[in-house]
């Protein structure tokens, strides 16, 4: 029997999703999939960032989601902070973040986060979170508290938030964000609508699009952003259709990257997309009117987020 208080990962986490994972032959990684390990000064900076995070009892999605770019990003002194704990209330079978019953919110986290960002002298920061379906506002007020504290401690720091879908709490969450909107509002669509039941149990494609559009309607000067994975069984045409939907919902920025299976208990990789196809996605995105598009095998939602925001005119 599941122990909801224990953090579940891999096969244990995905054992109870509605559509079971169908095993597939493991594909050989092509030459263009390369995980970069830091060395020298970059390795020292990597260890320094990890130590700083542990000292302040903070989590990063870089670590919790086993991001392949962690050595490069930490080595450059950048990190995507994950607030509200490291236990998610969802069981998405592409994601390596643990599932279970989350701990109560830490009221000191916004201040601790702001102090850490100030100590690291970050010009650009991404703040994300686990899903918190146990909270009445989905965690929106905690996001706003983190934005406020960070702005107070680091007025020149640009803040991007990567938010969950606030399922059943959208209106409450959007009203709360009126208190202190971020500089960039990011919510990932993740995949095409046909694959939502398999890849995003508990989420709804149209609902996620509406979240992005309604935030933009309330804050037309704040850039909106979304990200997609490829390799889950979608077609190129389906990806292009999602891109059109995003533009129709006034989304400004786009990321598309290759899905990599975190473990045998997660969804398998069904195809490796060639860099030429990523280039096609990027070209089409700009033609559709996205202000910036980052598309490539190792691109992740917050990978080089500062450079993407600069390209879109935010910083």
Curated annotation (Swiss-Prot):
Domain Radical SAM core residue range list: 74-291
GO cellular component, one term: cytoplasm
Top EC group: transferase
Free-text remark on how the cofactor is bound: Binds 2 [4Fe-4S] clusters per subunit. One cluster is coordinated with 3 cysteines and an exchangeable S-adenosyl-L-methionine.
Cofactor: [4Fe-4S] cluster
Molecular function per GO: 4 iron, 4 sulfur cluster binding; lipoate synthase activity; metal ion binding
CDD domains the record matches: Radical_SAM (cd01335)
Subcellular location: Cytoplasm
Major location category of this protein: cytoplasm
Enzyme Commission number(s) of this protein: 2.8.1.8
Keywords noted in UniProt: 4Fe-4S, Cytoplasm, Iron, Iron-sulfur, Metal-binding, S-adenosyl-L-methionine, Transferase
Residues annotated as binding [4Fe-4S] cluster 1: 62, 67, 73, 302
Positions of [4Fe-4S] cluster 2 binding: 88, 92, 95
Catalytic activity entry: [[Fe-S] cluster scaffold protein carrying a second [4Fe-4S](2+) cluster] + N(6)-octanoyl-L-lysyl-[protein] + 2 oxidized [2Fe-2S]-[ferredoxin] + 2 S-adenosyl-L-methionine + 4 H(+) = [[Fe-S] cluster scaffold protein] + N(6)-[(R)-dihydrolipoyl]-L-lysyl-[protein] + 4 Fe(3+) + 2 hydrogen sulfide + 2 5'-deoxyadenosine + 2 L-methionine + 2 reduced [2Fe-2S]-[ferredoxin]
Pathway: Protein modification; protein lipoylation via endogenous pathway; protein N(6)-(lipoyl)lysine from octanoyl-[acyl-carrier-protein]: step 2/2
Pfam families linked to this entry: LIAS_N, Radical_SAM
PANTHER family xref list: LIPOYL SYNTHASE, LIPOYL SYNTHASE, MITOCHONDRIAL
Family label: Belongs to the radical SAM superfamily. Lipoyl synthase family.
Protein name: Lipoyl synthase
């Amino acid at each position: 029997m599941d122990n909801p208080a224990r953090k579940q990962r891999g096969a244990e986490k995905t054992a109870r999703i509605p559509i079971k994972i169908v095993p597939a032959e493991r594909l050989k990684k092509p030459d263009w999939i390369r995980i970069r390990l830091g060395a020298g000064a970059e390795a020292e900076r990597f260890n320094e960032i990890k130590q700083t995070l542990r000292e302040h009892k903070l989590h990063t999605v870089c670590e919790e989601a086993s991001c392949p770019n962690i050595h490069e990003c930490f080595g450059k002194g950048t990190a995507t902070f994950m607030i509200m704990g490291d236990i998610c209330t969802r069981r998405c079978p592409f994601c390596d973040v643990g599932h279970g019953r989350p701990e109560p919110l830490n009221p000191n986290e916004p201040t601790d986060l702001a102090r850490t960002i100030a100590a690291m002298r970050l010009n650009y920061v991404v703040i994300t979170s686990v899903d918190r379906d146990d909270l009445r506002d989905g965690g929106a007020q905690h996001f706003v508290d983190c934005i406020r504290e960070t702005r107070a401690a680091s007025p020149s720091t640009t803040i991007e938030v990567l938010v969950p879908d606030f399922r059943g709490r959208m209106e409450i969450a959007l009203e709360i964000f009126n208190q202190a909107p971020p500089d960039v509002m990011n919510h990932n669509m993740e995949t095409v609508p046909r694959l939502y039941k398999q890849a995003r149990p508990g989420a709804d494609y149209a609902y996620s699009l509406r979240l992005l559009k309604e935030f933009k309607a309330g804050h037309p000067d704040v850039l909106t952003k979304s990200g997609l994975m490829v390799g889950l069984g979608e077609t190129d045409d389906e990806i292009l259709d999602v891109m059109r939907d995003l533009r129709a919902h006034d989304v400004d920025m786009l990321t598309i990257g290759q899905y990599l299976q975190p473990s045998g208990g997660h969804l398998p990789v069904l195809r490796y997309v060639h860099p030429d196809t990523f280039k096609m996605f990027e070209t089409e995105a700009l033609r559709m009117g996205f202000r910036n598009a980052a598309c490539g095998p190792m691109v992740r939602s917050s990978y080089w987020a500062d450079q993407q925001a600069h390209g879109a005119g935010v910083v």
